[in-house]
Amino acid sequence: MTNLVVAIDDLHPEQGWGCEGDIQVEYLSELNKKFGVKFNLFSPSYYHNDYPLTKDWVDFWKQFDWIELSNHGHFHDVSPQNKQHIGEQEFLELNYSQAEDRIKESLSLWKKCGHKPNGFRSPGWGINQESADVVSKYFKWVAKHEHINRDIKFNTKSFVGCDGINETENINLYNNDTFMFQSHIAGDWNDNVWSEDNFNHFQLIIDYLEHMYDLNFVTISELV
């Protein structure tokens, strides 16, 4: 069988970004009902220092056995003096001690919400080696970028793959057995988001892949 993972970044308790009643949530539910698709939802624990995770929000997602909640940093933001240069790549600017404090703060909030995430993806993909050393201590696996993170060593299980749900040509098979799609729940800075057009397009991708492969829809932790 050929595995298929769908990962979605940046979900947090803000309307339009992964809350009950959002149209994107309906899209995900429909894909699960129609095909059996499962999802890794990568969530910052305190998005932009404005939207902390809440137990109600976490519980909403945990009710679905086709969802895995994963860590996507804490603030998904950087200090003002660095923002122009590194965007929101939170773990590019932190040293070991700072990164450990940040991860502990993040996991503390997750714990208050009743969940311990197994996996991690860096906001904006960027991470330095000291931060990677910290991340490796606290998570069972990391989703990394095969090019951006090529010089970074993680002392934990790692997975690569970031094909967009809006792809039309370049869909890759990783490790000869896994399709790995990566997307964002919303945002106006790229086209790889859960719009109606991309939802419809992704259904065509799944239809095509199901005709070509015996698909096994999984979350990343099910691959560990």
Give the predicted meaning of each segment.
Residues 132-168:
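His/Asp/Glu-enriched short active-site or ligand-binding loop at hydrolase and phosphoryl-transfer sites
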Residues 153-175, 182-192:
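A conserved mid-domain beta-alpha-beta active-site/ligand-binding segment of alpha/beta enzyme cores
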Residues 37-129, 183-189:
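Metal-dependent polysaccharide deacetylase catalytic core of the NodB/CE4 family, i.e.
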Residues 3-4, 39, 174-183:
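Generic beta-sheet signal
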Residues 33-36, 143-144, 185-224:
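C-terminal domain-boundary segment and adjacent tail
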Residues 18-28, 52-56, 96-104, 167-168, ...:
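Well-ordered, non-membrane alpha-helical segments in soluble/globular domains
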Residues 1-66, 214:
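Active-site beta->alpha N-cap acidic-glycine motif
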